[in-house]
From Swiss-Prot:
This is NADPH-dependent 7-cyano-7-deazaguanine reductase. It comes from Baumannia cicadellinicola subsp. Homalodisca coagulata. Its EC number is 1.7.1.13. Transmembrane segments: none annotated. It is an enzyme of class 1 (oxidoreductase). NADPH binds at residues 90-91, 259-260. The gene is queF. Belongs to the GTP cyclohydrolase I family. QueF type 2 subfamily.
Amino acid sequence: MTDQQYQLLQKFKLDKSKISYRTHYNPMLLQPIPRTIHRELLGISSISLPFQGADFWTLYELSWLNKYGLPQVAIGEMIIDATSDNLIESQSLKLYLNSINQTCFSSEQELRNTLITDITKCINSQVKITIHSLSQWMTVPILEFTGECIDNQSIQIDNDNYIFNSNLLVNSVEREKVKETLVSHLLKSNCPITNQPDWGSVQISYYGMRINREALLRYLISFRKYKIFHEQCVEQIYCDIMQFCLPNTLSVYVRYNRRGGLDINPWRSNISYSPVNRPLARQ
């Protein structure tokens, strides 16, 4: 992220006077972040994206009042397409959902319609929202990323390897062409707005020249001090691998740990791809 882009993001920092939890419904709490801020750095045009994808959100702290004033709880799933103009700053979504806690809705469908209306306006695109009862969610099995884990390598990591560096992927491919899926649970980046850590697991599926595992792991570890949104991080990984490794096909899927009652799980791909939207062990 350039200094100019970082300064631009500062205007999106939440006003401290707004961070206190509101008990009255307020859709104005939602903070959109233009996707173009980071895509311009990557040389991506929103008119012709080099990938398809979506951002899977899980809303673990969804609560409201029914028409009798009785509190209700549920778990929500939200899918935002990568073509949306904006992403949502996660803390603002948390504050927005909290503003619903003391709001009466005549039905679960009215709540869902309200969420869809407000979030659609925020991202300037359609959104899919599903509300699950706790009993329904109890049946959702834990997902284990398929693929070969690259984390258990006997390599030395120096302090300068914790500074983001796309060039770690330079000359990182071998002549042999393969179709494989690689997994790492060591991804960590930081929120540009709150500076809080974001812990994630990444699954990289590709067909092309074999990617050197050590180089790839060093590259992923270099995000450790980097300030970048979840959605931007997956696009950075996708674009860097495409640029330096030149695969014919590529799919990148990252599932991030829950923070503030929310988890965000973005994926990007240049092929027909339908990732499984289920929680990992750390989620």
